[in-house]
Each structure stands twice: as structure tokens, then as C-alpha cells.
Amino acid sequence: QQDYTGSHFDF
């Protein structure tokens, strides 16, 4: 599990 909080990730 990865936490992409505060960054821009397009899924």
C-alpha cells in the first residue's frame, strides 16, 4: 500500500 497524499497522481 502506498500513500500518495499531497502529490498529484492520475488514475
From Swiss-Prot:
The keyword Nuclease does not apply. The modification Pyrrolidone carboxylic acid is found at Q1. The modification Sulfotyrosine is found at Y4. Isoform 4.2Y4 differs from isoform 4.2 in not being sulfated. GO terms for biological process: defense response; regulation of blood pressure. The keyword Transport does not apply. Keywords: Amidation, Amphibian defense peptide, Hypotensive agent, Pyrrolidone carboxylic acid, Secreted, Sulfation. Its main location: secreted. It comes from the Eukaryota. Expressed by the skin dorsal glands. It is found in: Secreted. One of its GO terms (cellular component) is extracellular region. The modification Phenylalanine amide is found at F11. Hypotensive neuropeptide. Belongs to the gastrin/cholecystokinin family. This is Caerulein-4.2/4.2Y4. It comes from Ranoidea citropa.
